[in-house]
Amino acid sequence: MDKLLIGGSKPLNGEIRISGAKNSALPILAATLLADEPVTIGNLPHLNDITTMIELLGRMGVELMIDEKMCVEVHANTIKHLTAPYELVKTMRASILVLGPMLAHFGEAEVSLPGGCAIGSRPVDLHIRGLEAMGADILVEGGYIKAKVNGRLKGAHIYMDTVTVTGTENLLMAATLADGKTVIENAAREPEVIDLAECLIAMGADIRGHGSSTIEINGVPRLHGCRYNVLPDRVETGTYLVAAAATRGRVRVKDTREDILEAVLLKLDEAGAHISTGPDWIELDMKGARPKAVSLRTAPYPAFPTDMQAQFVAMNTVAEGTGAIVETVFENRFMHVQELRRMGAKIKLEGNTAIVEGVESLTGAPVMATDLRASASLVIAGLVAEGDTLVDRIYHIDRGYECIEEKMQLLGAKIRRLPG
C-alpha cells in the first residue's frame, strides 16, 4: 500500500489548479444513462471513484470514449445489462446513483447495496421510498436493490425525512423522465445538486427550484445529448487554503469559485487569513502569522461543510487559542483525532464535539488514514509538524484528491509518495 512521506515546518507558497468536483462528476456520469443521444462530460477529475463509475457504466455495456483531457463521451443506448454488480459498488457508495436513471429510462434496475468510506450510517431507504412513491416495485434481497416499473414512473410529491444529497440526486434524475410533475421537499441544496440539475436541463429536462429546499420537476418524454463541464471541487479548494493557513503560507488556487465556499472562507478570515478573490481564483495569505483558533459547527449546505471539518481540526492543533468543532452531519467522524494526538495535538472529545487547544508545533510521526477527509487532515498536520510524518493507507486520499503530492510539491511542500 502506498504511503506519503512529508517533511514539515515550511510555509506553502505558490499557485495550483483545482480539479473538477468528484461529488458532481459522479451523479452527472450516472445521469448520462437518461439520454438517448451521446453526452460529453468535461473537467472530470482523475480519481479512483471516477474510474470506478466509468468502469461500472462500461460493465453494463454502455459505450464510452475517453480523450487525453479526461473528457468522456457516453452512449447510454448501447446498455446491455441493467445490473450494477457488488464488486464495483462495494468500493464506492455513489454507484447507488445509477438506480434512478436506469429505472426511469429502461424500466428496471438491479443495484448492489453500497460500500465506500466507513463514516456512520448512511441508509439508502430514502432513495427506495421515493422511487416507490413514483410507482416503482422494489425488492431488497441477496444484498441487491431490485427495482421495476410498468411503463413510466409517475410524478409524485416526495418529502425527504432527512436532507440527503445522493437521495435528492437519485430522485431528481428519475423524475426527469416520469409522467407528470414531481416535487421534492427538504431537498439537498448543495452546489453539486445544482450542477447536476443544470446538466439535466442542458439535456432537455424541465427543473425549477434547484438550490432551494423544494425542487419541482416536470417529466419530459426524452432527454437528448449535451456537452457539460463539471463544476470545481470546493472541498479540494478549501483543503489547499486551510493547508496554506496552517503553514502560515500564501497560496493562490485557480479554476475555482468563491461563491460555493462562503462558509469556509468566513472561517479562514476569522483565523486571520488575508483573502482576495477574482472571477476564477482565490488567494490566501497569512503574511507569516500563526492562525487563530476557530470554532465551528457542521451542517448541510449552505452551512459549514462536514467534508472540511477534519482540515480545520488540523489547523486548530497549531493555532493560537482553543476552538470547539461540532460535527452534526455524520457520527463517527473524528477518527483523525487519535492520529493527530500521536503527533502531539491537544484534543478533547466530548460527544460530537472536538475541543482543540493549539500547541506551538506538532511532531512528525507515523499515522494512518481512516477515511478520505481524515487523511487530508493528516497531510496538513504533516506539513506543519517538525520532522517527518509518514501517512499510511493513502488510498483514501486518492479517492478524493487528484495528484495531492504533485500539487503540494508545486507549493513547495516536501512530500513524496512511497510505493507500497
Curated annotation (Swiss-Prot):
One of its GO terms (biological process) is regulation of cell shape. Phosphoenolpyruvate binds at residues 22-23. It comes from the Bacteria. Its main location: cytoplasm. GO terms for cellular component: cytoplasm. NCBIfam families: murA (TIGR01072), PRK09369.1 (NF006873). This is UDP-N-acetylglucosamine 1-carboxyvinyltransferase. It comes from Hahella chejuensis (strain KCTC 2396).
